[in-house]
Amino acid sequence: MKKAVVVFSGGQDSTTCLVQALKEFDEVHAITFDYGQRHKLEIEVAQQLAKQLGVTAHKVMDVSLLNELAISSLTRDDIPVSHELQANGLPNSFVPGRNILFLTLAGIYAYQIGATTVITGVCETDFSGYPDCRDEFVQAMNQALAKGMDLPLMIRTPLMWLNKAETWALADQLGALDLVRHQTLTCYNGLIGDGCGECPACGLRQAGLKAYLDNRDLIMSALKSKQSAAH
């Protein structure tokens, strides 16, 4: 029996990955992390979608200790999300160590349930400057977890080399375009669906959707080319 653990936030990317995993695996376990993010609605959206999509199990883990260490606009209500980069060249929405912690816990969960695949929606193409969304980081984490648990673990990143328009094409290919567009929460200001239109996350999401809807055949063809190359 093929089992997978999907790191699931209820946003566009992780929901697309979850829908894809449900078509490929016999058992899909979703894991959502409560790290004190600004909007608890994110967790509620993840719970609703996991139930609606019919995952095998959905675990919500309290990792609020991250908020005690990591000062970020995503975890602190008194820090507005900014389009400007900080002195270190990173946006103020970067939560240091977040994906290190998330992938470690997802790997432990996979070990416990006998899964050898962890799926995450990180992407290097439109990664907002986050170093823990890069392929070299994921590869390093994959090696560390596999060695540390003596498990043939594979961290899969289906969106790693897709741009946002191609991610929308993938959702459409999976028959989930409307669900991803109207029921997911990507917005840093906590608005479901098309969002606020002003924060960096909404900017990426909306630009990608417009590009896809304006050039459906072209973008879908580009997606299929990347899928063929990956296999």
From Swiss-Prot:
Needed cofactors: Zn(2+)
Annotated Gene3D superfamilies: HUPs
EC number: 6.3.4.20
Free-text remark on how the cofactor is bound: Binds 1 zinc ion per subunit.
Name of one Pfam family that matches: QueC
Protein residues bound to ATP: 8-18
Catalysed transformations (reactions): 7-carboxy-7-deazaguanine + NH4(+) + ATP = 7-cyano-7-deazaguanine + ADP + phosphate + H2O + H(+)
Residues noted as binding Zn(2+) in the record, renumbered to the chain: 187, 196, 199, 202
GO term, biological process aspect, one: queuosine biosynthetic process
Similarity field: Belongs to the QueC family.
Function description: Catalyzes the ATP-dependent conversion of 7-carboxy-7-deazaguanine (CDG) to 7-cyano-7-deazaguanine (preQ(0)).
Identification of the protein by name: 7-cyano-7-deazaguanine synthase
